[in-house]
Amino acid sequence: MMMTKQKNTLAERLNIGDEVRELKLGSTFNPKNTSTAFHTIKYDFKPASVDTSRMATVDVGSNNQVTVIVPNSELALNVRLLIFGLTESSGVPHTVYKGNQREYAKECLMIYDKETGAITIEKLNHNIQVKKTRTEVTNKPVQLPAQSVPMNMGHQGQVLGTNGSVPPPMAQLAQGPLSGPGGKLENSTMRVSSKDKVDFKPRNSPMQQSSPSRPVVTHRSPQSAPAWDANNAQQTLPSIPMITDDDDFGLRAAFHNGGQANISGSSTGSSSGQPDLYGSSSSSHMGKQRQAHGKRQQIHQRSSPPVQQQPHYQQQQQPNYGRAYNGASNYAQPHPQQQRHSPHQQPHQQQHQRHSPQQQQQRHSPQQLQQQRPTSYGHSNNMPMDLDSSREHDLASQSVAQAAAVLEQQIGGALSASSSSSESDSSDSDSGSDSDDSTEDDRSMKEQQEQQQQQQLQHQQIQQPAPHHQRHQQQQSQQHMNQLPNLGLGSISPSYNNHHNHQQPQPQPQQQQMSGVYASNGGFPNDLLQNDLQLSSNSSDDDD
């Protein structure tokens, strides 16, 4: 029944009827046939514009590649012109298909001739499968004129627009036609982008560089950040915090604080080595004043090199004064027998006091020291050692002459007292020996008291008006002398002498020079005074 049904269906379609017909084999079954061949073509898509009345061309290339070109009908082209608004010459004349071919093994084709009613069977040679290609892209620039670009631009704007409207740059391009092959190439790329959803032209195309007046159409989301181009100088550069010369104020201020701290440290360290001249309270007070001056100076002055140079000069000045003081005042330290020559200490302390206002003025005015140049330090403060030593020798010679006159009177009184006591004690030897011992002790105590009183009187006469802290320091030095009468010139602080131990070998040659000066000035050398005292003591012993 199936066969009958199929025959009926086939007979109805071919209008053959129920009669029996002869089946013939075609020329393809003949092995000597080389002129006739039958092939089948399978299309993936066949447009309605294909003209069936015209012949198509099949091109078989190497490696079984086949290209089929099918012409389009004129009616289809006219319909396309009406829909898309294109001109007559802008239509696509044909459709191109490309694919590959494969040989058949056992496939046949039946051909029915309606005129004769004969049925012929032919053998199939190849099966060709092709797909539609966009070969009109390559052929289109040759045939498209420039005036067709504005309409395509409008269409392209509708394809690329997000809301279906033509963007403003596209509308501007649609107003003016483009000339030359560039417009044709532009149109071809637009056709491609309408299908693939890509940008309408490359960003770095040569056309964009040659015509800077044309606006650049870029389709991107509004949330994306603008790309920074290093070659474009007009764009805003990234904001980077720049360090200028004004920002150096903080660094210089910090360095300035360090310099002031070094000044205060060096000055307080040098002042701590002289407790007899400057008290600890006054040094701390001066340190605070220097810090206050340093803070004020940070606002007015920004020059750091003078600050760096000041501590070195200040440290060099104070050891120079220390050498002068040690050379003038410590010449009698190795001899403890010169206890009675304590008035020598008076002019040297006065000389210390004369020099002390200069040092205090230097410490209380660091701002003035910074304003001076390095050369002014040597001319104003660092006096030559020869001038200092000559002045000290003159002052010492005058003071020793006065002290020698006082001692001569005391020695004369002591000798007369000893002679009278020896005559009175000759009657009673036992009681005389005891009284001599007591009188000698009393005389030594009286002499010490008289010397202290004379020192106080000389202090009051020679001393100039001094600041409050200097008076306080002088009272401390007097109390120190009263408490330690047997030290003589050793009342200078041990810390100060230990601070300058390398200067102690100098007093011995200075002592020899000073003894010669004392003798030439009419005073008594130290050796003669000691011999007189020993003779007086020996005479008292002989009388006993």
Curated annotation (Swiss-Prot):
Pfam families: EAF
UniProt xrefs under PANTHER family: ELL-ASSOCIATED FACTOR EAF
Record flagged with keyword Nucleus: yes
Protein known as: Ell-associated factor Eaf
Primary location: nucleus
Organism from which the protein derives: Drosophila persimilis
GO cellular component, one term: super elongation complex
Skewed-composition ranges (Basic residues): 287-299
Residue ranges with Basic and acidic residues bias: 193-202
Role this protein plays: Promotes transcriptional elongation by Su(Tpl)/ELL. Essential for development.
Region ranges (Disordered): 147-544
Biased composition (Low complexity): 264-273, 305-319, 333-374, 396-407, 450-483, 503-513, 526-544
Localization per Swiss-Prot or TrEMBL: Nucleus
